[in-house]
Amino acid sequence: MPLELIAPRPRTAEFRTYADDELQPDQVRIRSLYGAPKHGTELNMYRGTNPFQEKQYDSEWQVFRQTEQRPTPFPMGLGNMFVGEVTELGSQVTNIRISDMVAGYGNLRETHTLPASDLLVTPDSMA
């Protein structure tokens, strides 16, 4: 089973196994090679200090106002972007090939299954 990096609770990271989603006709499966977290917003969520958790932004007054507490985001996947190699194609995918290098948005995990339209094929010069 592949692994992903999650935060089960604030300030705690661990690996968890997951099952790949079934590949749909418009989707691509990718083996992740590189990934990155989003240091600003994600770090606040990881720490459990995200102001959007208990407050709502008032755009008129440009301040956060107290609201009812929203559901906790934990467990949450960590990371938000990746680069990887295409390993499988759905039957309707025509613009991507097996072994293409692609970039996309997703958590830090070993594989991703996403619509082809959500991916950017990287130029050969980036290999």
List the predicted regions and their residue ranges:
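Short N-terminal strand-loop motif that marks the start
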Residues: 1-75
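Soluble, non-transmembrane catalytic domains of enzymes that act on hydrophobic metabolites at membranes
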Residues: 7-9, 98-101, 118
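Predominantly a core beta-strand signature of beta-propeller blades
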Residues: 15, 119-121
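A structural motif shared across PLP-dependent enzymes of the aminotransferase-like
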Residues: 105-118
